[in-house]
């Protein structure tokens, strides 16, 4: 199970709204002061904040730090959907477009259009998956 600490923003009727910050391994090692990659990553500004609703029977207070978890299977399937499906669509459509038309502009439009469509379909499917309980984070423990 993937674990992450989060801060409780609000709690109402068994639903805690928690906020966690996305972490990056870059900038955490001993060589971060002399590393160009770490310097470049600082130019991006703040890391993203993510807000989740977590069901819990334990009453929580605003500001408490909790640990939430997500099954690895959920994360792997999400990554597979987001990265592999559009990439495979791009590669397959590129190969098949050779047989469909000799006009390169038409082929480029077909390739980009179907790849964009695959991103849209993945996004809508991932929203449906996000509603399922195995894709929802769970409260593991209260840290403070």
From Swiss-Prot:
The keyword Cell membrane applies. Its main location: membrane. InterPro entries: RseC, SigmaE_reg_RseC_MucC. The keyword Membrane applies. It is found in: Cell inner membrane. One of its GO terms (cellular component) is plasma membrane. It is a multi-pass membrane protein. The chain crosses the membrane at residues 76-96, 105-125. Keywords: Cell inner membrane, Cell membrane, Membrane, Transmembrane, Transmembrane helix. PANTHER family: PROTEIN RSEC. Belongs to the RseC family. This is Uncharacterized protein HI_0850. It comes from Haemophilus influenzae (strain ATCC 51907 / DSM 11121 / KW20 / Rd). The lineage of its organism: Bacteria, Pseudomonadati, Pseudomonadota, Gammaproteobacteria, Pasteurellales.
């Amino acid at each position: 199970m993937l674990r992450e600490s989060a801060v409780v923003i609000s709690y109402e009727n068994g639903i805690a709204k928690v906020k966690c910050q996305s972490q990056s391994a870059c900038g955490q090692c001993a060589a971060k002061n002399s590393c160009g990659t770490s310097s470049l990553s600082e130019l991006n500004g703040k890391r993203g904040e993510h807000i989740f609703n977590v069901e819990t029977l334990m009453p929580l207070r605003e500001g408490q730090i909790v640990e939430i978890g997500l099954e690895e299977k959920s994360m792997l399937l999400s990554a597979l959907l987001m990265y592999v499906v559009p990439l495979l669509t791009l590669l397959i459509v590129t190969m098949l477009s050779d047989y469909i038309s000799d006009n390169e502009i038409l082929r480029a439009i077909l390739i980009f259009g179907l790849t964009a469509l695959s991103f849209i379909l993945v996004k809508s499917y991932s929203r449906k998956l996000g509603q399922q309980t195995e894709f929802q984070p769970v409260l593991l423990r209260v840290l403070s």
